[in-house]
Structures are given as structure tokens and as C-alpha cells.
């Protein structure tokens, strides 16, 4: 895949510790490198979000999460694979393989393989990314670039231009072990 210059620029910024905004399937998201504690701390401060809540990781394909799945039953892998890429987020046991600034106080981590072309292109270059809705805590998620500018004027390192994916609601969240819906779409 030949990546566009704007996605390549976003990838370079993320590798350097940037916090960026980007379009997703339904709303704008904020993201950064999940392994960069300073970047995650900045993202949480920008959102006024507690580290205890945990964050979603998004990826280009399921194999970007393979390091988490080593001891998972095949039925779990099949369950996730059947819904990805797409607007389905799964809460999966993280087995202490991720930093606490990603998982918060939870035994699980939220994972999604996006079907948004820009997100997939970006993740193909940098690997899994933090993804959280682009809004200060308690405010509606941004659905326009203008709202991004209003919410975060001067606080973001880059806004990756693009269109939302056309979904009205954020992704469905389910618990992988039980299949129960935690948040409807």
C-alpha cells in the first residue's frame, strides 16, 4: 500500500510522541502511541479524562493484536474475526501485557479493528493506536473539524484531514468472554 503524504506525516508525528485527531467511522477520535506514556498522559489531560478509565486500541488488522491472544481459545479469535474490520469493540483480557496507562484499573482492554480507510492506513504504518472520542470529558464527541478546533485549539500536534465514515453511533462494545453487550451502538 502506498500511503498518502498526510498519513505518512501523521505516522511520523505519532512516532515522535504526538497527540493527533483523526476521523473514524462515526466521530472524530484522538490518538497517540499506546507505548508512549508521555503522549498518553497528554491525551488524557487534553480530554480531562482519568487514567483509571482505560482506553481503546485500534488496529489495521487482527494480527496487530496477536501479542495479546497467545492463550486465547480459538472460539474467541473466531468471535472477534467475524466482526472485524468493523464497528465492533471487544473487551479482552490484557494479561498484564499492556501498560496501566492504557488499561486503567481494568482486567480487560478494549480492542477494535477499524474499517475506516484513513485509520487503517495509519495503523498499517504505526501499529495499534490509542483511540478515544475527540471531546473534553462530558461534552459531545466532535463530528466536524471545526468542533475539533473549538474543543482543542492549540493542544493537538496534528489534525489528520478526512471524512467520517458515515455511521451515526460509536462502535458496539462487547465482552469477549461472555459475548454480553456493554455499550450498544
UniProtKB/Swiss-Prot annotation:
The answer to keyword Phosphoprotein applying to this record is: no
Gene Ontology terms for molecular function: ATP binding; double-stranded RNA binding; L-threonylcarbamoyladenylate synthase; tRNA binding
One of its Pfam families is Sua5_yciO_yrdC
Q: What class of enzyme is it?
A: transferase
UniProt keyword Nucleotidyltransferase present = yes
Report one GO cellular component. cytoplasm
Note the PROSITE patterns from the entry. Answer: YRDC
> Boundaries of each YrdC-like domain copy?
4-185
Question: Which UniProt keyword terms apply here?
Answer: ATP-binding, Cytoplasm, Nucleotide-binding, Nucleotidyltransferase, Transferase, tRNA processing
Q: State the coiled-coil residue ranges.
A: none
Q: Which reaction does it catalyse?
A: L-threonine + hydrogencarbonate + ATP = L-threonylcarbamoyladenylate + diphosphate + H2O
Biological process (GO), any one: tRNA threonylcarbamoyladenosine modification
- Record's subcellular location: Cytoplasm
Q: Indicate the principal place this protein occupies in or around the cell.
A: cytoplasm
Q: Which Gene3D superfamilies does this UniProt record tie to the protein?
A: DHBP synthase
Enumerate the InterPro entries for this protein. DHBP_synth_RibB-like_a/b_dom, Sua5-like_dom, TC-AMP_synthase, TC-AMP_synthase_SUA5
Entry's EC annotation: 2.7.7.87
What biological function has been recorded for the protein in this entry?
A: Required for the formation of a threonylcarbamoyl group on adenosine at position 37 (t(6)A37) in tRNAs that read codons beginning with adenine. Catalyzes the conversion of L-threonine, HCO(3)(-)/CO(2) and ATP to give threonylcarbamoyl-AMP (TC-AMP) as the acyladenylate intermediate, with the release of diphosphate.
Of which family is this protein a member?
Answer: Belongs to the SUA5 family. TsaC subfamily.
Query: By what name is this protein known?
Result: Threonylcarbamoyl-AMP synthase
Species of the source = Pseudomonas fluorescens (strain ATCC BAA-477 / NRRL B-23932 / Pf-5)
Give the lineage: Bacteria, Pseudomonadati, Pseudomonadota, Gammaproteobacteria, Pseudomonadales
Amino acid at each position: 500500500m502506498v500511503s498518502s503524504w498526510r498519513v505518512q506525516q501523521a505516522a511520523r508525528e505519532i512516532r515522535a510522541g504526538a497527540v493527533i485527531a483523526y476521523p473514524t467511522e462515526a466521530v472524530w477520535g484522538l490518538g497517540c502511541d499506546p507505548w508512549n506514556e508521555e503522549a498518553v498522559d497528554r491525551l488524557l489531560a487534553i480530554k480531562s479524562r482519568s487514567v483509571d478509565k482505560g482506553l481503546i486500541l485500534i488496529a489495521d488488522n487482527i494480527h496487530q493484536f496477536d501479542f495479546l491472544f497467545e492463550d486465547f481459545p480459538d472460539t474467541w479469535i473466531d468471535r472477534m474475526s467475524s466482526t472485524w474490520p468493523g464497528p465492533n469493540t471487544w473487551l479482552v483480557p490484557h494479561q498484564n501485557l499492556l501498560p496501566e496507562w492504557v488499561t486503567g484499573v481494568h482486567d480487560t482492554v478494549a480492542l477494535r479493528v477499524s474499517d475506516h480507510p484513513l485509520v487503517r492506513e495509519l495503523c498499517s504504518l504505526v501499529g495499534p493506536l490509542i483511540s478515544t472520542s475527540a471531546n473534553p470529558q462530558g461534552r459531545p464527541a466532535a463530528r466536524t473539524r471545526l468542533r475539533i478546533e473549538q474543543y482543542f485549539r492549540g493542544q493537538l500536534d496534528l489534525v489528520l484531514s478526512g471524512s467520517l465514515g458515515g455511521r451515526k453511533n460509536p462502535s458496539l462494545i462487547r465482552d469477549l468472554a461472555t459475548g454480553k453487550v456493554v455499550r450498544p451502538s
